[in-house]
């Protein structure tokens, strides 16, 4: 405000120094600094009116503003009666300091322009930009300076002539950018012209400052000139990068505060400009340009969702206001420079030199483009002759040149630059700005049309017509649904049609199918290129959506989007966006150091996990984005040859991503688990935010309550962002405590194990024990996958024989003293612990612990002896089978019988038995005892020898005990042998679209519980549960499922099938109705490595009669609301609970 007041005081001083009429004196007395605000408001109103009236015409908006400004200036400075208060405001703004004028408008305009540029296009066009901005400006300055010196009659020296040449060599970014956006030029051409105008504006200012110093009498040698140029240019780049890095780091600490984020961008742009221009003596223009491009490259993904939209709209509004003011003010300055001067007659003689100077400027532009054309064709995207013509014709001049000429006028009136020279500089510059905007700006669209550069290519035209045809079909379907009403009756389709102008062709008729069934499927290379481009745009849009939803981080999003940008430049060949991701998706070389004892394993693990986690995010996001884009392309084009080609290319690229995820899953599954955990956490928190917002809409909660709940969820989101879960090896004591076997181990037994120095981590391919060797101890598996293989066991039906978290391996062999039944080899990174046989056998003195150990050993035998049934069943589910009434462990004496009904299966753990009713042969332990009237699919169909069958698998209804025997009988009728392992549909598959009213109904269904909360039921059921004493098997089941001893009632609410419906429902966990838009990136658990193979196996696996199958689950599913999606997925447990910690635990 001080500056405005000072300008007003200067204005009054000038008025008092001149002879003025009484009317002007009266106006002077009424002048007020507040009149400057009136000019701003009037300019904005005129700008709004111009934009509204000129919409749909060929007159550029900026040209209209310049004409309005000249008209206002002419009325104020040229007419006998001035404009009063408005005139006072015009004079206040007109007398503003040129440097202040640049400092007010340039930072906002330059930052908005450079921030909106696409990074990959900047990279590709950078060589062309630099050529036009540096050599181009120098060539233009030399040409203009030489022509002015030779042909103009003002007896200027070379320094003054070159000063005018440098001043007029800058194509103004404000004018050029505004014009290109309005005309809709191609992206490639817009990037070159816009980037050149940004860069050469800074270069021209530097050249101008250099020649101005020389013209003012400051002699400089070559060393000082080079030093000055390096300081101005390199210093500007360095300051821009410094401010960019500092502000982007600051942005990382701002969470969901759009106002602060936008304010930071404003503050940093102006502060960087001031620091460079006034404090460091560098170029403020180059500084802000560098800052904006740095933001475009590294901070674009920092603004997500509403913040990004708000930022875009804000800077669009700032650019619009600044453009409106600066072009009207430029017109005022031009009018004042021409009319309000004592040298009008002299300038009148200079009009012909003004037009001659305009011709020189066009010729110099032709020389610049012509000389650099061979190099321009070799860099970036290249340049053809049509684009060269547009490049020549788009060399507009604007506010920057005017501000520089004003500074020359202010510096004039001395022995070096006369006052007349300063006035001529302003006159020529204003005239050139007017002519380039009026002539070049108004005719650029005509030139584009003349060169046929505004015509849509045939493929795009066909796509447009096809889209209109599909829009017509959708409009007809919508009319069928909405056109008839019980109360109001039918609607009139012709009237509806008259309002839908978008469905009509150029001749006003409704569009018809444009392809006749074949054109859309033609193999035209241009059409194929266009479809690839649209496909990649869809992939990039999905990346943005995933970033907004928190599925990927900012760094990951930058990598993914850069790969798409690079692929967009090569759409003439097959899809290649995966090629740009390959350097980021691999196992790091230092992963091999995990085998080494030289480098600390924890350090190597930390860096390897960081790299693999990022690679998994990239791969999963790539697969999801391509899946969605393929579906969208298929929905849009249907069955077409050209669509099939692009879809096949996408699927081929996805194979490599799938292979990498499978490799990580088999080698380091903990990484995928952390990725999945983070994404699930974010999705759940977003679901809660949506639920809270819906509560506010329906009015069930008050504003204060909503704010409290919203802050609580935002706290969780902030914690997830700043302290995400990571993979870290847990402490041995924690691992032992969380293992299900620990419930049977006395504290005195566990304490020495917790302080053991043994290394718990085994890499892939390590053999834990070999088949036939003497049992030396038991292996506890805490995390990872262990593969088994055996020569004597008939495991032909086991497609993927593995054990995972919670397994106790070798326990049966230790209890019986028999050799190990199979080889055990780690199939991924495994966290495990070895306990000697003597320590385990010492626990058998307690009968309860002894029974538990036998039950625990039976879990592994089920998978070894009956892989057809139990191979894909997780350990926690088998423990649920053992811990319920579905199993019974019994010790038999000689002569007793063991009966196996049709819905059961038995395991002979100790002793010998003989089957009754068939060939009597001695059966030794271990053996699976199946009923003779059961489904034959459960029996081993391999061509194994008779000894194998006798030893490990028998069929009979009754068995006679020959010696003391121990057996456990399982009732698998409730288990459901025909049940495949249900999984939630992969989130790589795009979610089904659901209307907003369906989502609203699902939310309202959730609200019902708010009105009838069971306040006392928890306490009552808790008292009943506390009275119950859990067996060791039940406690082990809790540890296996939840990772710790838990409140049974609370867990039964979420996993009711385990406690309420016993085993029959423990495989199915009810899924919360999530927002379809909040799908999760797939990160499968280790049990899904061969899901496809498991499903194929079950096609051949027969089923026991399920007489005992309960109808509970059927009743439960029937009672579910019809509002729920019929394809609602199933949430499936991950076999091993994730050992996830937070970074503050490091």
UniProtKB/Swiss-Prot annotation:
Subunit record text: Interacts with CIPK24/SOS2 and CBL4/SOS3.
UniProt keyword Isomerase present: no
Molecular function terms, GO-annotated: sodium:proton antiporter activity
Keywords per UniProt: Antiport, Cell membrane, Ion transport, Membrane, Phosphoprotein, Potassium, Potassium transport, Sodium, Sodium transport, Transmembrane, Transmembrane helix, Transport
Function: Acts in electroneutral exchange of protons for cations such as Na(+) or Li(+) across plasma membrane. Involved in Na(+) and K(+) homeostasis. Required for cytoplasmic Na(+) and Li(+) detoxification by secreting them from the cytoplasm to the extracellular space. Regulates Na(+) content of the xylem sap.
Effect of residue 136 to E: In sos1-12; hypersensitivity to Na(+) and Li(+)
Regions of compositional bias (Polar residues) in chain numbering: 1109-1118
Transmembrane segments: 29-49, 59-79, 100-120, 128-148, 160-180, 192-212, 228-250, 254-273, 279-299, 314-334, 353-373, 388-408, 421-441
Pfam families referenced in this protein's UniProt entry, alphabetically: Na_H_Exchanger
Superkingdom classification of source: Eukaryota
Region (Disordered), start-end ranges: 981-1001, 1102-1128
Protein name: Sodium/hydrogen exchanger 7
A single GO cellular-component term on record: plasma membrane
Species assigned in the record: Arabidopsis thaliana
Processing after translation: Phosphorylated by CIPK24/SOS2 in complex with CBL4/SOS3.
Membrane topology term: Multi-pass membrane protein
Ranges in coiled-coil conformation: none
Stated induction or repression of this protein's expression: By Na(+), in a SOS signaling pathway-dependent manner.
